[in-house]
Amino acid sequence: YEMLRSLVGSEMCIRDRLLCIAVMPLVKPEWWEKHQAHAVILWSLLFAIPFALFYGAPKAVETVLECLIGDYLTFIVLLFGLFCVAGNIKLEGSLVGNPKVNVIMLAVGTFFSSCIGTTGASMLFVRPIIQMNSWRKNKRHIMVFFIFLVSNIGGCLTPIGDPPLLMGFSRGVSFFWSMRLFPVLVLNMILLLTIFYHLDKKAYQKDITKGLMPEVKENEPLIRIKGAHNFLYIVMIVIAVILSGVLPKLSAFQNAAGEVIGIPIFREVTLTVPAIIEIAIILLAALLSFKTTPKEVRVQNHFTWGAIQEVAVLFIGIFITMQPALMVLKSAGSGLGITKPFEMFWATGALSSFLDNTPTYLVFLTTAGAMHFTTGVATTLGMVPVKMLMAISCGAVFMGANTYIGNAPNFMVKSLSDENGINMPSFFGYIWWSLRYLIPVFIIDMIIFFL
């Protein structure tokens, strides 16, 4: 009965959230811009009040604080740090947006995602790609495929690339294990970049036919980087992320019971010392970036706080309202009857499209670890077969690209694109792009790698 009540509540929260995100910016864009915070408060109350009535106020407060302190705080600080540092790096030169250059930029950005994270790569490459294609009219497809590849799929090779893999690393999966996903990544890149090239070639020819021409910059180098020293601060942030997965395993950061030490907040909620260290390093990197970079670089980048503010407000509501669904998953995950790699791939991916992919990954990794396999990858949760772990990893990382809310960089890229006059698809419009181009690729992934 409790599970039924929780399930009904979670479905209502998810439905209301998605409808609000999808419809309100289209029907009342001015209202949405002014009242995002009110909408978030409403979503949160729709979860908190029934939850408090059913489980008690202390449990409701603990659940919300656990979500905000344990998940949201480090999440938004990481986004903030990368947003600040990347905003102080400007790539410029004589490169102009055409199909070949765009394919190369997307390919490079995709590989960068595994080196500095999908968020870091997105924030680093989004502005140059927008600027290179500023002369073009037909360009929304460029940013959609940017989200597909750079903001999501490219993060599959290392725990730095995407938080679910970092969660796997903290549960005993070796740091370089995810390099096994390289063939899957290459196949996806080939398929999606081929599709993109043909789409971009048609759009490019339309722009040329209409008389649009890029500005030719004479005596300009092919690529010039302003604020290149900020790459050091990106390295600082990457180190902070790695430490967040390494430090909790060390005995120096554990008490006698083996729990990670930290500052008690409320009941079982604790702000851990490794999280504090991660936050401090990231904020220091952001501060140093602003202190050591001339303001003119940010001006040339058209740097504003609008995108990060929108994401911060939006995702605090998402993190809170997804809690009932995650609770149902944790309690019923082992009874879902999902036992094969291809089932794990689609189940993890479908939920990662609308919920935070990190806890979703953990739920299915825990489920797989509890199946008493005798061969595979040894984790702290149990033995998980290689193919099943590949399926869970790919589902969580790849299918965050299915919606704007599947992964934080998605909405950041959308917001920055909107700020720069690119008419991005609506919430459901973007899902239609995913259905046309991503799902067929994922079906091919399933047939080749997970059956």
For each feature predicted by the language model, list its residue ranges.
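Single conserved hydrophobic/aromatic residue that forms the stacking wall/gate
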Residues: 1-9, 14
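Interfacial loop-to-helix junctions that mark the boundaries of transmembrane helices
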Residues: 10, 31-40, 61-73, 175-184, ...
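Intrinsically disordered, low-complexity non-transmembrane regions of multi-pass membrane transporters
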Residues: 10-11, 45-46, 199-234, 252-266, ...
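Hydrophobic mid-bilayer segments of alpha-helices in multi-pass membrane transport proteins
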Residues: 11, 15-21, 35-52, 72-84, ...
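Transmembrane alpha-helix boundary signature
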Residues: 29-30, 48-71, 80-97, 111-124, ...
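Membrane-interfacial helix-loop connectors
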Residues: 50-52, 113, 124-138, 142-144, ...
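Juxtamembrane and boundary regions of transmembrane helices in multi-pass small-molecule transporters
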Residues: 138, 157-158, 176-225, 398-451
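Transmembrane helical segments that form the transport core of multi-pass membrane transport proteins
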Residues: 236-363, 367-370
